[in-house]
Amino acid sequence: MKAVVTRVRSASVVVDDSVVGSIPDSDVGGLLVLIGVATGDTSATARAMAEKLARLRIFEGSTADGRPTEVSALDVDAPMLVVSQFTLMGDTSHGRRPSWSAAAKPAEAEPIFNACVEELRDRGLSVDTGVFGAYMAVESVNDGPFTVLVDIPSGDRS
């Protein structure tokens, strides 16, 4: 399972001219997370990804004595907008056309994607999503910009 995680000031996803998920503009902002599910990913992979995303220390904070520190979405109650994106699994190492062979088929990927979203919610995070498999327009106002890649190998339980 792969994720592109972007710290944003605001973000939204639109399907058929309707906003289906968003992160409102705020001082804290949130995380726009694009997730690709790989063949072989399991609920354990989804759980490991959710734990990593929830505790990834990429927000600015400060200690009680005012020293700067990095804090997680959990620490600052930052909302997430999580969007499925099978193209993250594209392999461009050969030729000019991406291969999608590493991407899980939709029937396999959707329950794993949903499990990751539920794991995030179970940790107390506010999570909006796009519509799995739909054509979506995603808009964001990046903060920083600050974007990281998270890769949890299939079956990883760490």
Curated annotation (Swiss-Prot):
Q: Name one GO biological process term.
A: D-amino acid catabolic process
Reactions that this protein is recorded to catalyse: glycyl-tRNA(Ala) + H2O = tRNA(Ala) + glycine + H(+); a D-aminoacyl-tRNA + H2O = a tRNA + a D-alpha-amino acid + H(+)
Checking Pfam families in the record gives: Tyr_Deacylase
Q: Which UniProt keywords apply?
A: Cytoplasm, Hydrolase, RNA-binding, tRNA-binding
Q: Might you give the EC number(s) for this enzyme?
A: 3.1.1.96
What GO molecular function terms would the record report?
Answer: D-tyrosyl-tRNA(Tyr) deacylase activity; Gly-tRNA(Ala) deacylase activity; Ser(Gly)-tRNA(Ala) hydrolase activity; tRNA binding
Write out the GO cellular component annotations.
cytoplasm
Query: Per the annotation, which location comes first and is thus the protein's main one?
Result: cytoplasm
The short sequence motif called Gly-cisPro motif, important for rejection of L-amino acids sits at 144-145
Q: Would the keyword RNA-binding be found if you checked this record's keyword annotation?
A: yes
Query: In which compartments does the protein localize?
Result: Cytoplasm
Lineage top rank: taxon: Bacteria
Function in brief: An aminoacyl-tRNA editing enzyme that deacylates mischarged D-aminoacyl-tRNAs. Also deacylates mischarged glycyl-tRNA(Ala), protecting cells against glycine mischarging by AlaRS. Acts via tRNA-based rather than protein-based catalysis; rejects L-amino acids rather than detecting D-amino acids in the active site. By recycling D-aminoacyl-tRNA to D-amino acids and free tRNA molecules, this enzyme counteracts the toxicity associated with the formation of D-aminoacyl-tRNA entities in vivo and helps enforce protein L-homochirality.
Return the similarity comment: Belongs to the DTD family.
Quaternary assembly:
Homodimer.
Q: What information about domains appears in the record's comments?
A: A Gly-cisPro motif from one monomer fits into the active site of the other monomer to allow specific chiral rejection of L-amino acids.
What is the name listed in the Swiss-Prot or TrEMBL entry for this protein?
D-aminoacyl-tRNA deacylase
Species assigned in the record: Corynebacterium kroppenstedtii (strain DSM 44385 / JCM 11950 / CIP 105744 / CCUG 35717)
Lineage per the UniProt record: Bacteria, Bacillati, Actinomycetota, Actinomycetes, Mycobacteriales
